[in-house]
């Protein structure tokens, strides 16, 4: 048997930065009330993990939400208990992701039900006494009060239709 020697010539690779960037073609998706999506490429780190696509939404300049006023321990009695209208209170915290998701819905409902329903937000981190008084264990929690009494509660970032059906029971639409 003849022995054959195979000589392989390998070029020495040039020095590269520690992070290699993989080229990606971003998909263009439209989000509601946005001009479009700008995507960042996927970046592969040495650990093998990848960062996802970064989505940036640019509002089209129209008013997208209504600022819901805050209620605190000091204003609770006058704004909620003594209100002549039914009151929707959103119990929330600044660090809560689902609270941020439901916030625009509460703002929209506040605007739609203006004159029929008062809407307020209560920060549970800043007002733990009231949150404890009403047994708040999950946020966001939306409670409806009528004549100063708790009538209904909806827990979690629910669809707008769920909140509307709860509200409509107490405002006589």
From Swiss-Prot:
Site (described: Contributes to redox potential value): 97-98
Tree of life domain: Eukaryota
Organelle targeting sequence: 1-57
InterPro entries, sorted: Thioredoxin, Thioredoxin-like_sf, Thioredoxin_CS, Thioredoxin_domain
Cysteine pairs bridged by disulfides in the record: 96-99
UniProt cross-references to PROSITE patterns, sorted A to Z: THIOREDOXIN_1 (PS00194), THIOREDOXIN_2 (PS51352)
Active site: 96, 99
Chief localization: plastid
Signal peptide: none
UniProtKB keywords: Chloroplast, Disulfide bond, Electron transport, Plastid, Redox-active center, Transit peptide, Transport
Keyword Plastid belongs to the record: yes
UniProt domain Thioredoxin: residue ranges: 58-172
Location within or outside the cell: Plastid, Chloroplast
Gene Ontology CC annotation, any one: chloroplast
One GO MF term attached to the UniProt entry: protein-disulfide reductase activity
Family as reported in the entry's similarity comment: Belongs to the thioredoxin family. Plant M-type subfamily.
The protein's role, per its UniProt record: Probable thiol-disulfide oxidoreductase that may be involved in the redox regulation of chloroplastic enzymes.
UniProt name for this protein: Thioredoxin M1, chloroplastic
């Amino acid at each position: 048997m003849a022995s054959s020697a195979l000589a392989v010539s390998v070029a020495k690779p040039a020095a590269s930065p520690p992070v290699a960037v993989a080229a990606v073609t971003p998909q263009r998706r439209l989000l509601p009330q946005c001009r479009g999506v700008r995507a960042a490429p996927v970046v592969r780190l040495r650990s093998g993990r990848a960062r996802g696509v970064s989505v940036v939404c640019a509002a089209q300049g129209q008013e997208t939400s209504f600022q819901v006023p805050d209620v605190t321990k000091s204003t609770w009695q006058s704004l909620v208990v003594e209100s002549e209208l039914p009151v929707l209170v959103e119990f929330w915290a600044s660090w809560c992701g689902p609270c941020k998701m439901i916030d625009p819905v509460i703002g929209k409902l506040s605007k739609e039900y203006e004159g029929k329903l008062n809407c307020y937000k209560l920060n549970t981190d800043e007002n733990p006494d009231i949150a404890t008084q009403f047994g708040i264990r999950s946020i966001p929690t939306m409670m409806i009060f009528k004549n100063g009494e708790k009538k209904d509660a909806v827990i979690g970032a629910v669809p707008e239709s769920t909140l509307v059906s709860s509200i409509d029971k107490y405002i006589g639409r």
